[in-house]
Curated annotation (Swiss-Prot):
<feature type="binding site">
    <location>
        <position position="54"/>
    </location>
    <ligand>
        <name>[4Fe-4S] cluster 2</name>
    </ligand>
</feature>
<comment type="subunit">
    <text>The cyanobacterial PSI reaction center is composed of one copy each of PsaA,B,C,D,E,F,I,J,K,L,M and X, and forms trimeric complexes.</text>
</comment>
<feature type="domain" description="4Fe-4S ferredoxin-type 2">
    <location>
        <begin position="39"/>
        <end position="68"/>
    </location>
</feature>
<keyword id="KW-0813">Transport</keyword>
<dbReference type="GO" id="GO:0016491">
    <property type="term" value="F:oxidoreductase activity"/>
</dbReference>
<feature type="binding site">
    <location>
        <position position="14"/>
    </location>
    <ligand>
        <name>[4Fe-4S] cluster 1</name>
    </ligand>
</feature>
<keyword id="KW-0004">4Fe-4S</keyword>
<dbReference type="GO" id="GO:0051539">
    <property type="term" value="F:4 iron, 4 sulfur cluster binding"/>
</dbReference>
<keyword id="KW-0677">Repeat</keyword>
<dbReference type="InterPro" id="IPR017896">
    <property type="entry name" value="4Fe4S_Fe-S-bd"/>
</dbReference>
<keyword id="KW-0411">Iron-sulfur</keyword>
<keyword id="KW-0408">Iron</keyword>
<feature type="binding site">
    <location>
        <position position="21"/>
    </location>
    <ligand>
        <name>[4Fe-4S] cluster 2</name>
    </ligand>
</feature>
<keyword id="KW-0793">Thylakoid</keyword>
<keyword id="KW-0472">Membrane</keyword>
<dbReference type="GO" id="GO:0009773">
    <property type="term" value="P:photosynthetic electron transport in photosystem I"/>
</dbReference>
<keyword id="KW-0479">Metal-binding</keyword>
Length: 81
């Protein structure tokens, strides 16, 4: 994934995305790459409805539904580039 370094470097561990998700798709997991020592993860991508509330809530533009869910899922949701 060509975006991973840029994306992971911008997460500040604020949990805004987790709180914004209406379906609890996201959760915070331990990660040493940021000050908060936690990062947003999406273990339940099959439950994502593509509402983009997580993207809107993110103050650093860390989240991208397209990056998290992959091409096949975003195509089926009509979100592909």
């Amino acid at each position: 994934m060509s975006h991973s370094v840029k994306i992971y470097d911008t997460c500040i561990g604020c949990t805004q995305c987790v709180r914004a998700c209406p379906l609890d798709v996201l959760e915070m997991v331990p990660w040493d790459g940021c000050k908060a020592a936690q990062i947003a993860s999406s273990p339940r991508t099959e439950d994502c409805i593509g509402c983009k509330r997580c993207e809107t809530a993110c103050p650093t533009d860390f989240l991208s539904i397209r990056v998290y869910l992959g091409a096949e899922t975003t195509r089926s949701m009509g979100l592909a580039y």
